[in-house]
Amino acid sequence: MAEQETISVSIFDKSFKVSCPPDEVQALRDSAHYLDKKMREVKSARTVMGLDRIAVMAALNIANELLTANKQRD
């Protein structure tokens, strides 16, 4: 099995321990930071919303960004 490194990332003020290959640590940290930013954007745009809904809305926004970028490349 390939070597894994366990790191702690903070997303929306919650800490998560995640394992990944050592050469992917920075990408994982960047991804966690990006998700945290997107969740905070969703939260600031609405007054009252539960954490699960914030996470789903952020995921939908990120998926839309990815699909739009893929279409523009094609």
Spans of model-derived segments:
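Long, hydrophobic or amphipathic alpha-helical segments
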Residues: D52-A55, A59-R73
